[in-house]
């Protein structure tokens, strides 16, 4: 009786349900993610301890605007008086939007790029991880004690280091047990660092944002110790249930899925696919589908032209029909075959792809959802 006259959207209704559930359960920490934009989003009713804004890209433009500054202004709407804010990778006019909003709200703002001057972030393959583990084991056996980290010359930022290489070894073992690649995070003041389970290239930027946010939370009184950093970064998928972020589902051939669904997301995916093709000498087989309301042409222009494509559609009404997508892709110089379902497309890719090569599945969160829902059918474990 209360909700029906308001005609809430699905997201608005489930947000209200989540808030009620969190209150009833008296959760220690609630992480609330904006649905779209920020200023007018239903989640913006709360006053949090910390606001985090990730990188700004072109998405939902029919609602948020057709320039990055307009989109940034909508996202800046979550910045509140005296609530610190962390902002991910941004530049130029977009950075000024957030700086001016933070000044108007009398709050402290941190841009994660400020960490780059004293932080080294690197993608590590599975073999690289084995080498890092061997080096750490040598440190441990020689009982080298690492220096205590000094306060860094940056407001509210005291970077986190491990005290004992054993923590890093345990973190690497957790990742290697899952046959995964990783992101390593090192600071110039210490010899060993953090190992991040999410290994997509975009995570090299995201992990800086996470570190900045965690450091501010520590300053606000949250109890976060060094061991928590190692456990959290190396075990994030199991602890959160997060799926579809450059997630490996099979070896021989490698099969990776990713939920990137716009041009901004595919810029990182393109770099990773280029590395796989040119450096690892693996031929690419790409299962691809999108929803109709995205800027499909911009994404198609970013896809490698020397790959074999399996065009398909997800099991949602918004999905672009596979034959229409294949026609658009053909005009962009991409060659392949269309399949009515994700299962059909992935099955064809697995049959055609030699063990030494590589299968990528993506283009839409719904494509990845269909894939993950059919892991047993496709024998992906």
For the regions a language model picked out, list residue spans one by one.
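Beta-strand->loop->alpha-helix junctions that form or flank phosphate-binding loops
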Residues: 88-89, 103-135, 139, 166, ...
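Glycine/aspartate-rich loop-and-adjacent alpha/beta segment that forms the canonical ThDP
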Residues: 364-381
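ATP-dependent carboxylate-amine ligase catalytic core
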Residues: 1-46, 62-64, 70, 92-93
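Nucleotide phosphate-binding/pyrophosphate-handling subdomain across enzymes
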Residues: 29-32, 42-44, 48-52, 56-60, ...
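Glycine-rich phosphate-binding loop signature in dinucleotide/nucleotide-binding domains
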Residues: 22-28, 276-281, 349-357
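Glycine-rich beta-strand-to-loop/alpha-helix junction loops that act as flexible
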Residues: 36, 288-290, 362-365
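C-terminal helical cap/extension that packs against the catalytic core
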Residues: 91-97, 101, 109, 166, ...
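Conserved catalytic-core segment of NTP-binding enzymes
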Residues: 38-40, 47-105
